[in-house]
């Protein structure tokens, strides 16, 4: 099983911790976030990973080498020249992720004990092109799903912005679910990504919404009783220490 770890971000929400290191190397319970994510993916059967890098890229590359590649097959997707955002990051890593099997995409600042093998199996069983980890959680931005939990749109409750732009979503018609920073993706999306990308840098969310009629993009609900934390912000670090220490 393959996985792409997003480790290229600037980590602005974690400053000043990220003034001298990449977000992926900020420590929780004595181990970098990257190590937590890699260990979790290894336990769940991942044997090949791609790590994208930009901010303090050399530190991540040195860490991977120091760890002997974590005992995995590791590829570095180098974005030092330009940070490509999530959609551009997936497309740049295409050469390592193409094939017949789906792959996992996991943010480096997401810590969870969710059984991603169950999510992966659900993805295959449903014949989805993309499966997104989602939860009923208070946030400002929501993915919108129909009764079959198929993606239909996106809304920012703070600004009123919607995707597709200008669409007015009637209250109560769609399930509003928060995205959890983990995707399972089938390589079937790559031709669609190529056609969508006018520039190298682009976000994956507008792509998903623009293609939700053509691709089977579904939500997979976080199981009750499982742990999940976005450690991309300082206020979550102490909670992460308690949960994963």
Model-derived segments and spans:
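N-terminal nucleotide-binding beta1-loop-alpha1 segment
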Residues: 1-19, 44
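Conserved N-terminal catalytic core of the sugar/cofactor nucleotidyltransferase
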Residues: 2-5, 27, 31-107, 116-118, ...
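Active-site metal-binding loops of divalent metal-dependent hydrolases
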Residues: 10, 108-110
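Hydrophobic packing residues within well-ordered alpha-helices of enzyme cores
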Residues: 14, 60-64, 193, 240
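Catalytic-core segments of class I nucleotidyltransferases/pyrophosphorylases
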Residues: 101-104, 111, 117-124, 137-138, ...
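A short, conserved acidic/glycine-rich loop-to-beta-strand motif
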Residues: 126-136, 141
């Amino acid at each position: 099983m393959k996985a792409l770890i997003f480790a290229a971000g600037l980590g602005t929400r974690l400053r000043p911790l990220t003034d001298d290191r990449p977000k992926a190397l900020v420590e929780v319970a004595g181990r970098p976030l990257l190590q937590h994510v890699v260990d979790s993916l290894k336990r769940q059967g991942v044997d090949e990973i791609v790590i994208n890098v930009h901010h303090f890229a050399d530190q991540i590359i040195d860490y991977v080498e120091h760890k002997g590649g974590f005992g995995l097959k590791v590829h570095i997707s180098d974005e030092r020249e330009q940070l490509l955002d999530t959609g551009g990051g997936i497309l740049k890593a295409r050469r390592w992720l193409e094939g017949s099997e789906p792959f996992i995409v996991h943010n480096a600042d997401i810590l969870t004990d969710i059984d991603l093998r169950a999510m992966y199996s659900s993805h295959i069983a449903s014949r989805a092109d993309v499966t997104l980890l989602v939860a009923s959680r208070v946030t400002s931005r929501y993915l919108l799903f129909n009764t079959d939990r198929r993606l239909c749109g996106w809304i920012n409750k703070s600004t009123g912005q919607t995707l597709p732009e200008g669409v007015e979503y009637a209250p109560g018609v769609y399930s509003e679910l928060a995205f959890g920073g983990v995707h399972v993706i089938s390589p079937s999306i790559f031709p669609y990504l190529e056609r969508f990308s006018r520039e190298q840098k682009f976000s994956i969310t507008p792509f998903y919404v623009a293609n939700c009629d053509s691709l089977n993009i579904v939500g997979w609900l976080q199981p009750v009783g499982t742990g999940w934390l976005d450690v991309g912000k300082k206020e979550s670090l102490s909670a992460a220490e308690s949960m994963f220490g």
